[in-house]
Amino acid sequence: MDVLVVGIGVIGSYLAHAACDAGNAVTVVARGRWGDTIRDRGLVIHHHVQHKTTIDHPYVVDGIPQGERFDVAFSVMRQDQQIAALDQLEGIDADLLVLVGNNLRAQELADRLRSHGHARRVLFGFQSTAGIRKADHVECVRWGATGLDVAPLHGEPTASDKNLLARVFTGGYRPNWTHDFEDWLLYHAAAVLPMCFVSYLCGCDLRAASHELLRQMVAAQGEGYALLARLGHPVAPEGNEGLLDGGLKTRMWLAVVWIVARTKIGTLCVDDHCRHAPDEMRDLEVGFERIRGLAPDFPMPAWDALLARMGNWNEVCRRWGT
């Protein structure tokens, strides 16, 4: 299968590795020194939890191909980058386009693709990996082979969608099919943003967070979940019902959060991303505020307190922006 991956950061790099590992002909879009590094040395990934290093040799281009034929194309970028690259994304000749990553402007993006006459299928997805891109390799944190949570923004995937991605990913990495991916993206934002507030509050070092601060973070996540439920969004992914309602699952989640915050996993999964992507986190929070505007009287005291303690987004971006 001919596969295109646009955006070779941590997430895009592992997705490209999974596609290469399954025997596909993979083309990646990587510019500048990073593109040169992949051409010269290969796509080198150190898998932190698995204690192994992989090297793949995808074909590297420095711009989104226009008119070249692919079976599947993955765009793995921030929501603002996806929108800025809309004209180039629309020009990709592929049976299926999958937009991967945090995105609270997904409906806008889908509408604009449709208005631009994009006739092929568009799915949205998220890959639960984290880490940091170094000068010559990627440090990747993942559990097991992981996979790609994926679905249309609204509705169910088609049989042809499932068959196509099943042919792309034939190893341990698999598509985790769901439905109505807008719900998935909203609940993910509700979980991630309080982690970001605490990370920035602690100087992008979760190890400095007190147990009480972590409790407040989990309470804020619960408020975000409750808001979305109030607005009629079913909990996503399925199985997370009751995770943040204050019961046994919540206490177990708090224990997991405490372990993550005290180890390198927290550094790679949360702190490094916050340190290198403050603009993305700001945009995600702005998007969630728009959702809050649909229920302006819904109380979120823990959320608001953490956001206030974190400080002004302009100051955060000025401190951590590159």
What is each stretch, according to the model?
Residues V3, A25-V26, L97, V122, ...:
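Hydrophobic anchor at the start of a short beta-strand
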Residues E139-D149, Y200-A209, K264-R275:
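Helix-loop-beta segment of a Rossmann-like dinucleotide-binding subdomain
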Residues E182-Y225:
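Active-site-proximal catalytic alpha-helix in oxidoreductases
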Residues L43-V61, V192:
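N-terminal glycine-rich dinucleotide-binding loop that anchors FAD/FMN and/or NAD(P) in oxidoreductases
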Residues R105, L109-H188:
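Rossmann-fold dinucleotide-binding core
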Residues T53-E139:
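Rossmann-like NAD(P)(H) cofactor-binding subdomain of soluble oxidoreductases
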Residues M1-H51:
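NAD(P)+-binding Rossmann beta1-loop-alpha1 motif at the extreme N-terminus of oxidoreductases
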Residues G222, A229-T322:
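NAD(P)-dependent Rossmann-like dehydrogenase/reductase catalytic/cofactor-binding core
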